[in-house]
Regions:
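Alpha-helical transmembrane segments and their membrane-interface boundaries
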Residues: 2-13, 17-147, 160, 164
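Conserved small/polar residues in nucleotide/adenosyl-binding loops
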Residues: 221-223
Length: 223
């Protein structure tokens, strides 16, 4: 009897250890702070829009010159993921107004991004597709895995008490929302429909699965 009780106690201790080890609510910020962070990141006015256009131009140059370092720099400053998290927040909190506002805002960001990239590639003297451009035209299952993992990590980073964490920059690089849109601009500028469809499909995959992962994590945090 004592032996059985000892086993049950050990099991309970293990459950407690694992629960604490993988808890996402233990060091979470308050709901008010989470809301403020996510909605601020999803704004399409002021600083966010200026930064987005700069990021698009930087990413376009990087893709056009086949420079991985420049592309990474553009992904680090891109605000696109903020809009996806804001849409997800509106979904989980059952706020139709937030969902609509940030969905429209995200669509505007996409249009401006593609238009900016198209103008750049129309003016660029380099017309040949680089390795980095072509890499954004063939989405596969691994892109889905990256987007899901990135969405989970991204929302966890946004909901921590400590804002000064290194999660968001890493997620921005991993999920790569900006380069596919720039590739769409290249495809439009050069009349390449197949490349346009492939690049936009990759962008949709990334955005959708980041959204799904964010929904799941926000639900678990009980926003």
């Amino acid at each position: 009897m004592k032996h059985r009780e000892g086993i049950e106690k050990e099991r309970e201790n293990l459950r407690t250890v694992f629960k604490k080890m993988f808890s996402i609510t233990e060091d979470a910020a308050s709901n008010e702070e989470i809301r403020d962070r996510i909605l601020t990141g999803g704004k399409i006015t002021g600083t966010n829009m200026v930064v987005m256009i700069c990021a698009i131009l930087i990413a376009s140059v990087g893709l056009n010159t086949n420079s991985v370092a420049v592309i990474i720099g553009a992904m680090l400053i891109s605000p696109l993921m903020g809009s996806i998290l804001a849409i997800s927040y509106g979904t989980v909190s059952n706020d139709a107004y937030l969902m609509k506002r940030h969905s429209v805002g995200f669509a505007v960001q996409i249009l401006i991004s593609v238009a900016t990239a198209t103008i750049y590639f129309l003016l660029s003297p380099i017309k040949e597709p680089t390795e980095q451009l072509l890499a954004r035209t063939n989405p596969n299952f691994f892109d889905v895995m990256i987007a899901l993992a990135g969405g989970i990590a991204g929302i966890v980073g946004q909901t921590r008490q400590d804002k000064a964490n290194n999660i968001i920059p890493g997620v921005a690089i991993a999920t790569a929302l900006m380069p596919p849109l720039c590739t769409c601009g290249y495809a439009i500028a050069n009349g390449n429909l197949r490349m346009l469809l492939g690049a936009f499909y990759l962008f949709i995959i990334n955005a959708y699965f980041i959204y799904i992962a964010s929904d799941l994590m926000l639900s678990l945090i009980h926003i």
